Curated annotation (Swiss-Prot):
The keyword Kinase applies. PROSITE patterns: THYMIDYLATE_KINASE. The lineage of its organism: Bacteria, Pseudomonadati, Thermodesulfobacteriota, Desulfovibrionia, Desulfovibrionales. GO terms for biological process: dTDP biosynthetic process; dTTP biosynthetic process; dUDP biosynthetic process. GO terms for cellular component: cytosol. It comes from Maridesulfovibrio salexigens (strain ATCC 14822 / DSM 2638 / NCIMB 8403 / VKM B-1763) (Desulfovibrio salexigens). Phosphorylation of dTMP to form dTDP in both de novo and salvage pathways of dTTP synthesis. This is Thymidylate kinase. Its EC number is 2.7.4.9. It is an enzyme of class 2 (transferase). The gene is tmk.
Length: 217
């Protein structure tokens, strides 16, 4: 089973992935956790380019193809083998990020981005996507605080440095994309306590796992 987490900066994806991983492992599941960009050896090198503040001159098209390259390697080297081995694999971001950030955020064609991602993922779309939704002003404050505390602003702060207008477009893009793919994407209000958020996530994941067991078992 393949689960992804999506959302603008500062929604608390990392915290919720840790909670979900612990819950699933305690329930007897074999779980792998990964992320984009950077889930493979090659991806780690691409991540340095994509998130670094020195890359502010990168064009939208260049950014797109670097993300697609990262994803193709990630799927082939990490995600597909884990799914085939019967594991639950959880990824912090996946193809929806590219469709939303580069499409709704940068103004590229979402339909074209979907088609390009179809090539990159080679049929390995998530079984379930958790979209953590929050007001961009709140999310950006959280993300900036985190990067400053962890001294990662230079290395990984390029998207946090984007305008509030950009992040508003991304948020609206996520909600639009979720509505178009509501069989797979569930929206969870991230402006709650971590435990309240996880309660909702756990219910959605358990429901999907039971459905997957009935279908395949």
């Amino acid at each position: 089973m393949f689960i992804t987490f999506e959302g603008i900066e500062g929604t608390g994806k990392t915290t919720q992935i840790k909670k979900l991983t612990a819950f699933l492992e305690e329930s007897g599941h074999n779980v792998d956790v990964t992320l984009e960009p950077g889930g493979s050896r090659i991806g780690k090198e691409l991540r340095k380019i994509l998130l670094n503040m020195d890359s502010t001159d990168i064009t939208g098209e260049c950014e797109l193809f670097l993300y697609l390259a990262d994803r193709a390697q990630h799927v082939g080297q990490v995600i597909k083998p884990a799914v085939e081995a019967g594991k639950i694999i959880i990824s912090d971001r996946f193809a929806d990020s590219t469709i939303v950030y580069q499409g709704y955020g940068r103004g590229l064609d979402p339909k074209l981005l979907r088609e390009l991602n179809d090539v990159a993922v080679s049929g390995n779309w998530p079984d379930l996507t958790i979209l953590l939704d929050i007001d961009p002003e709140i999310g950006l404050k959280r993300a900036m605080t985190r990067n400053l505390q962890e001294n990662k602003m230079q290395e990984e702060g390029r998207f946090e440095a984007e305008s509030l207008e950009f992040h508003n477009r991304v948020r609206e893009g996520y909600l639009t994309w979720a509505a178009l793919n509501n069989d797979r994407i569930v929206v969870v209000n991230a402006d709650q306590t971590p435990d309240e958020i996880f309660k909702e996530i756990k219910a959605k994941v358990v429901e999907r796992i039971k459905g997957d067991f009935v279908t395949n078992g």
